[in-house]
Design a protein with these regions (language model features):
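Hydrophobic alpha-helical membrane-insertion signals
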Residues: 4-53
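Conserved GNAT-fold acetyl-CoA-binding loop/helix
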Residues: 26-46, 226-242, 272, 282-283
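Acyl-donor binding region in acyl/amide transferases
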Residues: 82-164, 169, 285-361
């Protein structure tokens, strides 16, 4: 059998191999949505990824002989650790063949790099914080993921768990069928809230003042999510970069702000689920100088019949005011008018029991679970752990 090695990414060719690794390993999986290669290169570029203005990443490739069999990114996020008083390192962009030795070597390489920065645990997957794509799919592998949600083969959770990782948090996706008019319970709750608080108004995001509107959403997001597990505030640069990324797919009727006496107190953001259109592009907008992928994506986007409700946030002092039913009722009505058959609500923290009760009362059903794992670095880097020969060195850097 060919020798298994893990090495850090240093050259342009290695960076290309790192990006292409996921496409090579998952191209036969019909449920995988190939991200645009342009976006994947930008994710690793300090000029295009605001996270890298304060965070650090180290990329690793696993080879068996000359064949790339896996990859991982070690992620150091000083803002997260300052916010939580922790010493957590992270891993992301994990992709690996079903090879336990390769996975173990990748995790040990990432862990060793983070240990050099005084981190004590390895948490993930996150790309590169909880504000972005995160979690390992642990069920429903036969269904494609929604827009901006991850997908992985069934082997991934096994590879992670067999390296000593344990679950630290689950993130759930729920499905909400779109029907003519909001569900009766939601309709009654929204009507009661409107009667009780006549000063609540729900409006669409004004795209002509997009930057100012996104600044309002950012403030609401930070206030509403500040006590959530894993939350870390986004910098102004990060949020504006995300807002620019979302702008081309934003539908104003599904992007809502709730105000009380003219002051924003809540928001909800629902996007068309363009994952099927992205699959048609195959990871490239252009081939041989011709916009074939773009044309296929635009054609498929006209057939979209699902959306993803990706965020709802309410400032604490208005959580009992009935503003959430008003936002959801407006969203349900707009989604039905757009011809949507269902919305995926994702993700919802596994410890958010009040949200579970609300979703069940609306007739939603839980569809997918994404898991965040954690491992102590002392256990991961234990010299007595068999299998990879990394007892004397963090990784083979040849």
């Amino acid at each position: 059998m060919d020798v298994l090695t893990v090495s850090p990414v240093r050259t342009r060719a290695q960076r290309t191999a790192f990006v292409e690794c996921e496409y090579a390993l998952r191209r036969e999986d019909r449920c995988w949505t190939p991200p645009l290669r342009r976006d994947q290169y930008r994710l690793l570029d300090r000029a295009h990824n605001a996270f890298l203005s304060f965070g650090e990443i180290e990329l690793y490739l696993a080879h068996r002989g000359r064949e790339v069999v896996g990859r991982i990114a070690a992620v150091y996020d000083p803002r997260f650790n300052h916010h939580h008083g922790a010493r957590d390192g992270f891993f992301g962009l994990f992709a690996c063949v079903d090879d336990q030795d390769a996975a173990r070597m990748l995790f040990r390489a990432a862990g060793a790099w983070l240990a050099e920065r005084s981190m004590t645990s390895l948490v993930g997957p996150v790309n590169f914080s909880m504000n972005y794509e995160c979690g390992t799919l642990i069920d429903r592998f036969d269904e494609p993921a929604a827009l901006l949600m991850p997908w992985n083969p069934p082997s991934d959770p096994k590879l992670i768990e067999n390296c000593g990782f344990t679950a630290v948090q689950d993130l759930h996706a729920w499905e909400w069928e779109c029907t003519p008019g909001p569900p009766a319970l939601l309709d009654r709750a929204a009507a009661a809230a409107a009667a009780r608080r006549g000063d609540i108004t729900i409006r669409s995001v004004d795209l002509s003042r997009y930057e100012a509107e996104m600044d309002r959403v950012r403030e609401l997001y930070h206030h509403a999510w500040q006590d959530n597990w894993g939350f870390v505030p986004m910098t102004d640069h990060e949020f504006r970069q995300l807002a620019l990324r979302l702008r081309p797919v934003l539908r104003p009727e599904l992007s809502l702000i709730a105000e009380v006496d003219g002051e924003p107190v809540a928001f909800s953001l629902t996007l068309p689920n363009l994952a099927p259109a992205l699959r048609m592009a195959g990871g490239r907008l252009h081939r041989w100088g011709v916009p074939l992928g773009l044309a296929r994506m635009l054609r498929e986007s006209r057939k979209v019949r699902q959306g993803r409700l990706m965020a709802v946030g309410v400032v604490e002092e208005h959580r009992q005011s009935g503003v959430v039913p008003l936002l959801l009722a407006r969203t349900a009505d707009a989604a039905h008018r757009l011809g949507y058959e269902a919305l995926e609500i994702s993700w919802v923290l596994g410890n958010n029991k009040p949200a579970f009760r609300t979703l069940r009362s609306l007739g939603c059903r839980r569809t997918k679970t994404y898991r965040i794992y954690r491992c102590d670095l002392l256990d991961l880097l234990d010299p007595g752990d068999p299998g990879t020969g990394l007892a004397d060195r963090p990784c083979d850097t040849t």
